[in-house]
């Protein structure tokens, strides 16, 4: 069996694994929140092969841009590259599998500091026109933003799902239930990803049972709809938050 087919099979198998329980889905999202610039497909495969990864890049980028050498014996993380006419494999390496050489540097990985939270809250309230009731805490604001983004893009992310449910647990559910559960799962997943990446505890507003319907998405054919929604929506928000954090970062003392 080819390596390409092995990785395709791994994606299918791991989709079943991460949708096995609320805790499995949250464990996947812990990894995905750190790698929010990657697609759902990539996040899923990175979680399957290197769940503790924090910053991944190709060998060429590490060597030529960051002047970091990949450690001898390090195993690349295989991802599916579907940008060309034929699917092929591409490999990335986590920063933990590299070391700096002369002139080397580390990628900027923003971290929200406690003194920045009020500024981020104000920024989100302005950009997303949040109501006052949604700005009591940063967690409230993140949940409101997640809810708004999912609501605004729901039709796009549901498009085609009805044709993919055959052979999954969604097959026995009616359209209204699928739509309602998808909206809630997507909202809670986006919020979880945002909260985790911002260094907050998502379980202050959520309970494990909020993800109970993830088990209905028991094949990659349907999980991809939810995963793509959560990944793409959280990415745009987190890029904005990251830029805002950088704006309000205090200069290092000289």
Stretches found by the model and what they are:
Residues 1-250:
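N-terminal accessory/interface modules of nucleic-acid-binding and processing proteins
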Residues 252-254:
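Positively charged, low-complexity/disordered segments
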């Amino acid at each position: 069996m080819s390596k390409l087919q092995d990785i395709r099979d791994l994606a299918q198998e791991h989709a079943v694994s991460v949708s096995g329980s609320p805790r499995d889905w949250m464990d996947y999202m812990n990894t995905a929140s750190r790698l929010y610039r990657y697609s759902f497909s990539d996040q899923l495969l990175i979680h399957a092969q290197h769940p503790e990864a924090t910053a991944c890049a190709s060998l060429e980028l590490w060597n030529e841009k960051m002047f970091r050498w990949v450690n001898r014996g390090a195993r690349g993380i295989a991802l599916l590259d579907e940008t060309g006419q034929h699917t092929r494999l591409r490999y990335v390496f986590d920063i933990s599998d590299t070391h700096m050489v002369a002139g080397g540097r580390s990628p900027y990985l923003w971290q929200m500091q406690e003194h920045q939270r009020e500024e981020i809250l104000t920024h989100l309230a302005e950009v997303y026109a949040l109501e006052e009731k949604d700005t009591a805490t940063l967690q409230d604001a993140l949940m409101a933003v997640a809810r708004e983004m999912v609501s605004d893009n729901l039709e796009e992310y549901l498009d085609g799902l009805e044709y993919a449910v055959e052979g999954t647990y969604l097959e026995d559910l009616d359209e209204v239930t699928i739509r309602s559960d998808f909206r809630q799962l997507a909202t809670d997943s986006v919020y979880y990803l945002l909260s985790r990446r911002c260094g907050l505890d998502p379980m202050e507003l959520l309970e494990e049972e909020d993800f109970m319907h993830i088990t209905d998405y028991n094949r990659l054919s349907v999980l991809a709809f939810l995963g793509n929604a959560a990944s793409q929506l959280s990415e745009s928000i987190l890029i904005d938050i990251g830029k805002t954090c950088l704006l309000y970062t205090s200069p290092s003392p000289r």
